[in-house]
Amino acid sequence: AVNRGFGGDTLNTSVYIARQTDASALSVHYVTALGTDAFSQQMLDSWQQENVNTDLIQRMADRLPGLYYIETDDTGERTFYYWRNEAAAKFWLESDRAAAICEELATFDYLYLSGI
């Protein structure tokens, strides 16, 4: 059986922090870029249900999200397959909103960063 989920180091961290904090006391934002496709929308909807603020996520009509697939063998060993060379997240700094998003991030108390 194939199970679909959304994850990655920065998203997992954002979701875990959002789950452990009072949303009125701490706003957890996630910054990335996604496409305008239905799969990207499902990702956004899922993150919003976890109380992760998605206002700073850019949508790129000509891009799709990066994907990875994890295969687990009978002993529990995992093998990872990645498709992210053309992922929207790889290009978000080239967008028109990038400078404004960076300025807004400069006002945040804490940042957790990662990259591909």
Predicted stretch roles:
Residues T13-L26:
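A short, Lys/Arg-enriched amphipathic alpha-helix followed by its capping loop at the start of a domain
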Residues A25-G115:
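Conserved N-terminal subdomain of the carbohydrate kinase-like
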Residues V2-Y16:
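Short catalytic helix/loop segments, enriched in acidic residues and glycine
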